[in-house]
Every structure is written in C-alpha cells, then in structure tokens.
C-alpha cells in the first residue's frame, strides 16, 4: 500500500485508534467527547497541567456507563465490575500506563460521590486527591447534557466558600424536599 492510501485509511478510522467506544452512538456521548477534547486543548493553550488519565477517563466514561446501564438506571455492582474490562478493552488499542488505571478509576468512582451531598460526604469528597479532576469531568458531563442540573454550581460554591457557608449549602439540600432527580445518579442523557 502506498503511504497516501495508509494515511487515508488512518484518517477514516481515527476514532477506532483513539478510544474503544463509539462516540457517535449517542448525541450525549459525542458532546462529552468533544467537550473533553476542547477542555484539554484549552488547558494546553493556557499552560495548565494536562493529565492523560483525565482525558482517558472522560473519553471512556460513555463506554463505562453503557456497560452498567440496566433499565435506565446505573447498576452499581456492574459499575464497579465494568471498570477493569473497559480499561482492558482500551489497552488493546492504546497503551495506558498502570499508574493511570487507579487515577481513572478514582475519577469514575468520585462521579458517584459528587452526587452525594449530605452530611460529611461533601467534605470527604473535597479532600480526595483526585477531587479536582473528578469535578472537572462532572462539569463536562453537565455541559454535555441538555437538561441542566445544579450539581456543578453547588460544588463550585461548596469549594469556594468557608465552612459556615458550606454548612448552609448542605442544609439547603436538607431543607428542600429532595425530589427524585436529586436521588438518582447521572444526567438523563447518560442513562439512555
């Protein structure tokens, strides 16, 4: 084969070599992948740190959710059991250093914890070494969703305020009659 022909084949199949999921599968997945790549470009241009583990976690998030969905809800057992198979499938395409495996899993697990904002859980989540990366992924997930929720706004306020205001934020959730949308995990587009 000529070099030109090989280049054309690589361009045509570029998604196949990047990630082991089908970002075109849903509009939400496509938006999330696009937002993750834009975010990485923006961070790179402004000389902020860029971690391959974060990008891989974001790109594989739709694949992980796809593996653990059951009747429009996340099956938590499947969620935890699906992490390693999703990473192994990706490693057939792209080498992922071992040190990033735990980093990626931490970001994914924190997505669950970011939805739990009662009691001392928000303080524990905020102190986690991977909080910032998980927070950024949650913002990308929220940005990719058409139905906006206040999760990103809440966490932004929680991390920027002092302890008294943090308590008020937690209490404001208690005072609200927590309807079903606060009790479920994920954004509606993720659960299709």
PLM features: residue spans?
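Single conserved hydrophobic/aromatic residue that forms the stacking wall/gate
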Residues: 1-13
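Short alpha-helical scaffolding segments that buttress acidic/His motifs in well-ordered protein cores
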Residues: 5-8, 51-59, 135-138
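Glutamate identity and glutamate-enriched acidic tracts
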Residues: 6, 22-24, 35, 63, ...
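Alpha-helical structural elements
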Residues: 9, 23, 56, 149-153
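Charged substrate- and nucleic-acid-binding regions of tRNA-handling and nucleotidyl-transfer enzymes
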Residues: 13, 88-192
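Helix-loop elements that line ligand-binding/catalytic pockets
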Residues: 16-96
């Amino acid at each position: 084969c000529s070099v030109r022909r090989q280049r054309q084949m690589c361009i045509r199949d570029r998604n196949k070599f990047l990630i082991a999921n089908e970002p075109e599968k849903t509009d939400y997945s496509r938006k999330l992948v696009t937002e993750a790549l834009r975010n990485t470009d923006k961070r790179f241009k402004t000389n902020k740190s860029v971690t391959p583990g974060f990008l891989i976690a974001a790109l594989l998030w739709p694949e992980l959710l796809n593996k653990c969905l059951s009747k429009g809800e996340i099956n938590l057992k499947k969620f935890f059991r699906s992490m390693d198979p999703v990473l192994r499938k990706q490693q057939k395409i792209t080498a992922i250093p071992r040190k990033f495996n735990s980093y990626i899993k931490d970001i994914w697990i924190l997505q669950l914890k970011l939805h739990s904002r009662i009691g001392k859980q928000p303080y524990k989540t905020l102190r986690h070494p991977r909080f910032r990366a998980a927070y950024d992924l949650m913002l990308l997930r929220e940005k990719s969703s058409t139905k906006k929720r206040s999760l990103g706004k809440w966490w932004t306020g929680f991390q920027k305020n002092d302890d008294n205001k943090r308590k008020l934020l937690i209490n404001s959730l208690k005072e609200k009659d927590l309807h079903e949308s606060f009790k479920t995990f994920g954004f509606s587009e993720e659960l299709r």
